[in-house]
């Protein structure tokens, strides 16, 4: 009986060591969503076009038709966002062994176990990480227009996760990396 109590106390103490806010979790979920969307879009043919004609008619009664790249169409992006939260089942909450910093770790990358899994301690979660899917749905529901507009941009950029998750949705506190300043082309004062 004493052994069971000590084990239970040890597990509770271990679980108490991992405290992070829902904002931190949403930050990492938001970044994971951006990554998953980027990967899903990269798999599509960038030249495939979609007809986005509405129910508008011109003066002669013909429907007005407009074609856009499929990966930039609102319909495609919305459908993709509706499915993307299922990917959160592939992630686990973890903390880095080196600094105790919270992260979400995707378990399988390119059909292989994530090599970073040896660098982290996995967080035992009472809900078996099902909250990640709920956080994903919440992030997308609250920011669906932000995601669509960002992914419709002609150039996505390298720091799209920071632009969406930090600058617009305000889940993270990161800022984009500044461009390097060219000292060679400038005169001294």
Curated annotation (Swiss-Prot):
UniProt-recorded Gene Ontology molecular function terms: protein-folding chaperone binding
Phenotype upon loss of function: Formation of embryos with altered dorsal-ventral patterning, dramatically decreased levels of ea in the perivitelline space and reduced processing of ea.
Compartment(s) where it occurs, according to its Swiss-Prot or TrEMBL record: Endoplasmic reticulum
Residue span of motif Prevents secretion from ER: 186-189
One Gene Ontology cellular component: endoplasmic reticulum
Alphabetically ordered keywords of this record: Developmental protein, Disulfide bond, Endoplasmic reticulum, Signal
Keyword Signal set for record: yes
InterPro entries for this protein: CNPY, DUF3456
Residue intervals passing through the bilayer: none
Signal sequence range: 1-17
Domain Saposin B-type positions: 23-176
Superkingdom assignment: Eukaryota
Cysteine pairs bridged by disulfides in the record: 27-172, 30-165, 85-136
Principal location class: endoplasmic reticulum
GO-annotated biological processes: chaperone-mediated protein folding; maternal specification of dorsal/ventral axis, oocyte, germ-line encoded; polarity specification of dorsal/ventral axis; regulation of protein processing; regulation of protein secretion
Family: Belongs to the canopy family.
Purpose: Involved in embryonic dorsal-ventral patterning which is generated by a series of serine protease processing events where gd processes snk which cleaves ea which then processes spz into the activating ligand for the Toll receptor. Required during this process for the secretion of ea from the developing embryo into the perivitelline space and for ea processing.
Name of the featured protein: Protein seele
Species: Drosophila melanogaster
